[in-house]
């Protein structure tokens, strides 16, 4: 265990549920986090902002929150701003890091300006001439492509497009989820990886090998045939360097304390960062518990470690 007296945390709210497209995942994460904290002796209580006003946190004497909300107002800076207003310490990034981290478009703009490698991309706005934009994008980026709403997590509405004819429909589908759509060149040849970040813990990279085309919502939260390779199979020196770049990708967005940075390798071993996640899933399929377990850190110890980061100035 961490050696922290659980009484130091005071009364803790585990925020989960919410109203985003990721509500069901958040409910699962939150229940497990709640149990993990209670197992460690923390005075933790469930709190679903979809069912109760946030003012109840202050009224009921909560001093700290473990944010297990995913997507929407739980991850885009809004809940963080409210918690700041009420003077409640919380896990994860603050307003700026959360807002940028959930916005794939602005994430990529920051990375381009700070030297973090990211796949070439184009943006499409809801209301654009999709057929014309599709033709232009294929000419610029080639195929295959990934189409993503700019501000959804858990691979909600992410589509892999292999033919030019399929692109307009994919754009239309993504535009129902967000007014900005990202179209990204698919990086092929080296596989998908994630770097889990939790304070000063040195967690291993995970190589993700989905049974399907890519690591989509089903592969993340439903399927049991996705492979998670720990160790990831890369040389130690390369893994260390990739973890350093991942931490930089996280830091330049203003993200703090804990999260994930996802990236692809091409056939030559070059990394291209896709996104960060400032409120990672904590289900039994999720990546941070897997990375922690690989270095001997159990679920309860991990959530206490994450919560302990709120004790820092």
Curated annotation (Swiss-Prot):
Alphabetized InterPro entries for the sequence: ATP-grasp, ATP_grasp_subdomain_1, D-Ala_lig_Van_CS, D_ala_D_ala, Dala_Dala_lig_C, Dala_Dala_lig_N, PreATP-grasp_dom_sf
Coiled-coil blocks: none
GO CC annotations, alphabetized: cytosol
Domain ATP-grasp residues, every copy: 108-308
Residues that hold Mg(2+) 2 according to the record: 275, 277
Pathway: Cell wall biogenesis; peptidoglycan biosynthesis
Magnesium in keyword set: yes
Compartment(s) where it occurs, according to its Swiss-Prot or TrEMBL record: Cytoplasm
Disulfide bridge map: none
Residues the record lists as binding Mg(2+) 1: 262, 275
EC primary class: ligase
PROSITE patterns: ATP_GRASP, DALA_DALA_LIGASE_1, DALA_DALA_LIGASE_2
Positions annotated to bind ATP: 138-193
EC number of this enzyme: 6.3.2.4
Pfam families named among the record's database cross-references: Dala_Dala_lig_C, Dala_Dala_lig_N
GO biological process: cell wall organization; peptidoglycan biosynthetic process; regulation of cell shape
Single Gene Ontology MF annotation: D-alanine-D-alanine ligase activity
Cofactor: Mg(2+); Mn(2+)
Cofactor note (record): Binds 2 magnesium or manganese ions per subunit.
Reactions performed catalytically: 2 D-alanine + ATP = D-alanyl-D-alanine + ADP + phosphate + H(+)
Record's keyword terms, sorted: ATP-binding, Cell shape, Cell wall biogenesis/degradation, Cytoplasm, Ligase, Magnesium, Manganese, Metal-binding, Nucleotide-binding, Peptidoglycan synthesis
Biological role: Cell wall formation.
Family indicated by similarity: Belongs to the D-alanine--D-alanine ligase family.
Name of this chain's protein: D-alanine--D-alanine ligase
Species: Burkholderia cenocepacia (strain HI2424)
């Amino acid at each position: 265990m961490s050696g922290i007296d659980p009484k130091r945390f005071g009364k803790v709210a585990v925020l989960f549920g919410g109203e985003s497209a990721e509500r069901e995942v958040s409910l699962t994460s939150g229940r497990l986090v709640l149990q993990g904290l209670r197992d460690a002796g923390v005075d933790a209580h469930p709190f679903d902002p979809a069912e109760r006003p946030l003012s109840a946190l202050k009224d009921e004497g909560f001093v700290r929150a473990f944010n297990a909300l995913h997507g929407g107002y739980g991850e885009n800076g809004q809940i963080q701003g409210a918690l700041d207003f009420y003077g409640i310490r919380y896990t994860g990034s603050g307003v700026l890091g959360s807002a940028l981290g959930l916005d794939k478009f602005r994430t990529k703009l920051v990375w381009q300006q700070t030297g973090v490698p990211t796949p070439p991309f184009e943006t499409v706005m809801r209301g654009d001439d999709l057929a014309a934009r599709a033709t232009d994008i294929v000419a610029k980026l080639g195929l295959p492509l990934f189409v993503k709403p700019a501000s959804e997590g858990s691979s909600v509405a992410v589509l892999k497009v292999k033919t030019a004819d399929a692109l307009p429909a994919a754009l239309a589908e993504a535009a129902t989820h967000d007014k900005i759509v990202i179209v990204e060149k698919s990086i092929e040849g080296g596989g998908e990886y994630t770097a889990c970040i939790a304070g000063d813990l040195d967690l291993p990279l995970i190589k993700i090998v989905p049974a399907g085309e890519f690591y989509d919502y089903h592969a993340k939260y439903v399927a049991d045939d996705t492979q998670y390779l720990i160790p990831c199979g890369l040389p130690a020196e390369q893994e260390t360097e990739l973890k350093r770049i991942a931490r930089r990708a996280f830091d330049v967005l203003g993200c703090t304390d804990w999260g994930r940075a996802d990236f692809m390798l091409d056939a030559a071993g070059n990394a291209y960062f896709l996104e960060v996640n400032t409120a990672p899933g904590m289900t039994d399929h999720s990546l941070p518990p897997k990375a922690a377990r690989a270095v001997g850190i159990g679920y309860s110890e991990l959530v206490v470690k994450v919560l302990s980061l709120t004790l820092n100035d």
